[in-house]
Amino acid sequence: MLFRSKLERKSYEITKQYYFIEDWKASIAESKNFISSYPNSPKAEEVFYINLRSNYLLSKNSVEKKKEERLDKTIESYLKFIDLYPQSKYLGEADDIYTTCKKLKEELNSQKNGL
């Protein structure tokens, strides 16, 4: 059990480290690994939020060609997050991310349609 706890803590710290150095792709990958390996961890909610925020920041800073797909992934991540953690302390920030992503998608669609 102690060994698993150390591995869990290490994975958590790596996820946070990638997030803080703004390596969004690595943060997303490591947070997914953490969530699949330790779904019942007390840190799972925070790591899922880091995953959501990393998806958002990656999509926001993407080239136009990849932006829509990444916005869709962020919205999907948000929907999973609120399904799993409807009373989360991160709910306000998560809702803001969702609202911003919807607006960005609308802007992209209106640009595509020449409006």
Q: What do these predicted ranges mean?
A:
Residues 1-115:
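Acidic, polar-rich low-complexity tracts and alpha-helical solenoid repeat scaffolds
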